[in-house]
């Protein structure tokens, strides 16, 4: 199974992260669904949307210090805390990224595989404008890039996995998100998945999210995307196969 690369993970604005590779979950990344929780029984909105948050590193203090100027907050579209819900609303994360909601949809679409049901509840396209060098550096790190151009756009998918079985399962999260015929996101290619490696308890659920890089500099013209969820495991054996492709409308 693959696990979250995890060096940043959880807020919203953009990067959710659970990047590629087989690494521990000791560091948490953050992304655009600030109200999302990786815990199966919780879903709360306590902190503002964030492109990324610092991992436990020497950069942590630097990443927590950004404060927007007064003129940046004197706008009816500014959201100090809470989810970005309407196109045009924006906020700032702690590392200095301005997050502007470009598109949002609530498909509430489901797909099943074995004892698991996946329900996609929200899809958002976020414009991320880095206001600091730290914001650009951490975004590039989170998306496994040498550097990133600002503004950049991220696709965020919020979903819940329901386990209808009598045994706990470890999910491998999202196998891939297909933006179009030529572009596909996965754990090794700019997709940060908070669900990868998490356990869904028997007769329980996991509310979670993922964020991927949609484009740099130019706003993508996405109308639909497709998502495919990976398999799930029990005692290191695959007991749930990957799902079919699920079409999502933005």
In which residue ranges do the predicted regions lie?
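Bacterial N-terminal signal peptides that target proteins for export
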Residues: 1-10
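Classic N-terminal secretory signal peptides
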Residues: 12-14
């Amino acid at each position: 199974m693959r696990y979250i690369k995890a060096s940043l993970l959880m807020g919203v604005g953009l990067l959710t992260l659970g990047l590629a590779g087989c690494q521990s979950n000791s560091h948490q990344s953050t992304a655009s669904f600030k109200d999302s929780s990786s815990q199966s029984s919780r879903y709360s909105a306590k902190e503002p949307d964030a492109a990324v948050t610092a991992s436990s590193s020497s950069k942590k203090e630097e990443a927590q210090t950004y404060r927007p100027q007064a003129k940046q907050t004197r706008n009816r579209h500014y959201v100090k805390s809470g989810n970005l819900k309407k196109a045009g609303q924006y906020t700032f994360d702690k590392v200095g990224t301005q997050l502007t909601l470009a598109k949002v949809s609530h498909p509430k679409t489901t797909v099943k595989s074995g004892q698991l049901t996946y329900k996609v509840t929200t899809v958002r396209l976020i414009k991320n404008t880095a206001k600091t060098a730290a914001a650009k550096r951490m975004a590039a790190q989170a998306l496994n890039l040498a550097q990133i151009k600002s503004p950049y756009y991220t696709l965020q998918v919020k979903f819940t996995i329901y386990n209808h079985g009598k045994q706990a399962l470890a999910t491998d999260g999202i196998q891939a998100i297909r933006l179009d015929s030529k572009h596909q996101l996965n754990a090794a290619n700019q997709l940060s998945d908070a669900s990868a490696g998490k356990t869904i308890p028997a007769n329980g659920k996991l509310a979670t999210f993922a964020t991927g890089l949609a484009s740099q500099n130019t706003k993508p013209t996405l109308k639909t995307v497709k998502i495919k969820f990976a398999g799930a495991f029990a005692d290191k054996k695959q007991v749930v196969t990957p799902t079919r492709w699920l079409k999502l409308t933005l």
